[in-house]
């Protein structure tokens, strides 16, 4: 009997998660907490598949000393269930660091510590996750969906579920025409690839981008390679500080999602425009001041190892075996300079991974708005034309749900809303007359 046919004999899952980063991890915890207190008939069965060999969240950006830009209280659970045993505070207690963290007097743990928290939480629901397992496509079936999975050893298996939840995370975004290569990296891979420079004594490193990731990459490379010139190229005249003021931060509140979802399209566009400086192409003020102070002290000493090439853009990139020639244009004058660099790092942002290649023929049943964007209900369920199982999106919903679509800020609440939506639809299905007849 084939592995696929063996899989088909298993019960149909209520929820099948595709991807197991922070968003679907929060969902797994929400399901686990529901099942702990629910009667057996009300529990949810679930499984999560992730193509990574083990849990990981942006490992290539885990620069030592960098801090989270979101409060630890916006962890996997607290905004949904402050009493949860999966909170960041519970993690600290388990690690015997609670008092130490309190004495640290910060709301923002380092990224390395927060990643350790995520790994700790993932291990506690590890029985729900299947790593080294890539979902290839899904097909509608009477029970919901049949999902084909390729495992690390090459086996293909199938699983069935009434609902699927996509949480595919982010992928690198680079300028049109740009190509990554041996000497051209994206900052998502910075910590994975920086070891390639060991023993090479690089002379010049160039970073392109205007946001937090670009500033962090610039700072890290400048500190790590004390003999190298580090050039930061960005089109603004100066780095823009992130607006993390209290009133602006309300745009990340759960209530703001309600307001945004119900707003007219022109109001949504206004809100996105007003508050882009909370998240996009902005830098923490402390880091801006640190980079400026460093550049100034170099000027005092009569050297210039940190170069901030503001109001500039890259016009050409020529990669060779020993380096990459980066042509930079100063926008006010049009003057061009070629930077012969050992490495070029694009820190030009990320975009949500598109789930629709996995949907196959199912995609034609998904409704779209007048702009061709996917139509999504308030509970993150894709609106479909026919009676399909539930398709839920964690990410890629900025046009309907606002800035928190791909951020950690609302992850705990969103997970609870998706779980509760699945329960609500299941109750409705069970109360239908044809369900009672089929059970009789």
Question: What is the meaning of each model-derived region?
Answer:
Residues 67-100, 259-267:
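Flavin (FAD/FMN) cofactor-binding and adjacent substrate-gating region
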Residues 1-53, 59, 101-212, 216-440:
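Flavin (primarily FAD) cofactor-binding/catalytic cores of flavoenzymes
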Residues 50-51, 57-60, 69-76:
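Charged, low-complexity intrinsically disordered tails and linkers
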